[in-house]
Amino acid sequence: MKRVFLWLIFVLAFHKLLAEKIGDIASVVGVRDNQLIGYGLVIGLNGTGDKSGSKFTMQSISNMLESVNVKISADDIKSKNVAAVMITASLPPFARQGDKIDIHISSIGDAKSIQGGTLVMTPLNAVDGNIYALAQGAITSGNSNNLLSANIINGATIEREVSYDLFHKNAMTLSLKNPNFKNAIQVQNTLNKVFGNKVAIALDPKTIQITRPERFSMVEFLALVQEIPINYSAKNKIIVDEKSGTIVSGVDIIVHPIVVTSQDITLKITKEPLNDSKNTQDLDNNMSLDTAHNTLSSNGKNITIAGVVKALQKIGVSAKGMVSILQALKKSGAISAEMEIL
């Protein structure tokens, strides 16, 4: 039987052992990237550009030539050396005029390849319609698997800044990346302990309002806040990718004793010691597996998802079969952790 490999990735999910910095689990509201987009032309393609049937490309070429005082009808242009593209980029917070940002280019016509071409100067707009950057540059051979998209490192220059006065603010808001009542209160109490009462107040499971002490500027205060360690409570969760067979799980997630059957495989999960020593294999964490009867024992201790997966691997269950068994365990109530199926 062909062996099917299942990649099992264990991430720490201990509620008491996760020590994080506040800056790792929370962001500052208002301090974020802004998305930019633009429409432009890639020139210099060796016959791999859009065909003459792409009317918007031919019209764009005509408009570009007219901007340099060359007038020609779009119907008279037969070039295959030009491709119409969309350019996207992220404008980071506090970026200044003259700073460079990376851009991503994607063909929108019927070009065969945009590799080796040159992006003509293209304005990049934000959702407010204003131009914030100008993009231009040569497209070097990058991803050979996709000839219709490319990245240009430092391919755009920032022309307009997003105004944000952080220095004179007295209060800001922190937003937890993963909403949790316990974590919100933990951040509140930790900040009040470090800086004094009433510096922080949790408004909901995601939001903590902070007020800077008078002895700090807001920049100094946020710099200190982000470096403060905190005991972070992570939610027990299992993520299953049915297509690839990948399982991401916390190592301490408990599986209660049960008998589960999926397709032609039956697995008994128990805390009772095994009697059949002849067919018993010792697994990690004091777990034993009776391969003759497909019985997994934790020898009186809690059974974890890690042990269950290792047992299934030992008895030759396929990746698809493992996913089915885990789903069955969740539906039966043997696993209380949240499960997300991709």
Curated annotation (Swiss-Prot):
Keyword field: Bacterial flagellum, Periplasm, Signal
Main subcellular location: periplasm
InterPro entries: Flag_FlgI
Keyword Signal: yes
GO biological-process terms attached to the record: bacterial-type flagellum-dependent cell motility
GO CC, any one term: bacterial-type flagellum basal body, distal rod, P ring
The keyword Signal belongs to this UniProt entry's keyword annotation: yes
Family: Belongs to the FlgI family.
The protein's role, per its UniProt record: Assembles around the rod to form the L-ring and probably protects the motor/basal body from shearing forces during rotation.
Assembly, per entry: The basal body constitutes a major portion of the flagellar organelle and consists of four rings (L,P,S, and M) mounted on a central rod.
PANTHER family: FLAGELLAR P-RING PERIPLASMIC PROTEIN FLGI (PTHR30381), FLAGELLAR P-RING PROTEIN (PTHR30381:SF0)
Protein name: Flagellar P-ring protein
